[in-house]
């Protein structure tokens, strides 16, 4: 059996060509230098994903600096409202990142209180449960939640964002003492101006 050259895609991660690829995917056939390159690449990938100082969010989900500029100017709620209203050229990516940040701010216990006040057959219960499930998913893995939100059709995403914003406003009305996302954004801006 003749030794084939190692697949360059497999060396640098994973080959997507499947059976069409004519190069070797059998690591036992590979020369030592190819194995070392693959091992080095995989170790760097693991190290990068574990390093908290590197902004993996922008690399993995595409949350670029432009999105953060919009968020700084408009605030999280402003970005989401702009996306719903199709103004300020807010991208789906920006909206999903802002939505993830809003979900961090909302306490699921507050939503459960609102849900318990509803009639048993109210359609709002389903909306509350959906938002609660997004909050719990976001707490476990916010990058995966951003990815799930991005996969929603635009109209469904807009409806989900609108429902979440409505719930957020209801919580603020029922708990006026708690600081809101907008208040925190304003406070950050004031600190930047004065500091």
UniProtKB/Swiss-Prot annotation:
Region (Binding to the phosphoprotein) location: 126-163
This protein's GO CC annotations: host cell cytoplasm; host cell nucleus; virion component
Protein modification: Phosphorylated by host in infected cells. Only dephosphorylated M2-1 is competent for viral mRNA binding. Cyclic turnover of phosphorylation-dephosphorylation of M2-1 is required for efficient viral transcription.
Chain spans, region Globular core: 76-171
Modified residues (Phosphoserine): 58, 61
This protein's domain notes: Contains a zinc-finger domain on its N-terminus essential for its anti-termination function. Contains an oligomerization domain. The central globular core is responsible for binding to RNA and phosphoprotein.
The protein, known as: Protein M2-1
Organism taxonomic ancestry: Viruses, Riboviria, Orthornavirae, Negarnaviricota, Haploviricotina
Gene from which the chain derives: M2-1
């Amino acid at each position: 059996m003749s030794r084939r050259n190692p697949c360059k895609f497999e060396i640098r991660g994973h080959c997507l060509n499947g059976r069409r690829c004519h190069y070797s995917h059998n690591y036992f056939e590979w020369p030592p230098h190819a194995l070392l390159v693959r091992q080095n690449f995989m170790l760097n990938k693991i190290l990068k994903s574990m390093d908290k100082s590197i902004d993996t969010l922008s690399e993995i989900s595409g949350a670029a600096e432009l999105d953060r500029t919009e968020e700084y100017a408009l605030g999280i709620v402003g970005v989401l409202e702009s996306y719903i209203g199709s103004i300020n050229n807010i991208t789906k990516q920006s909206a999903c990142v802002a939505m993830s940040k809003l979900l961090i701010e909302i306490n699921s216990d507050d939503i459960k209180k609102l849900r318990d006040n509803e009639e048993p057959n109210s359609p709002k219960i389903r909306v509350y449960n959906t938002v609660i499930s997004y909050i719990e998913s976001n707490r476990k893995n916010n990058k995966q939640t951003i990815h799930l939100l991005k996969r929603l059709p635009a109209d469904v995403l807009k409806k989900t964002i609108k429902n979440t914003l409505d719930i957020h406003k209801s919580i603020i009305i029922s708990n006026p003492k708690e600081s809101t996302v907008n208040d925190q954004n304003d406070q950050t801006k004031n600190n930047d101006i004065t500091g």
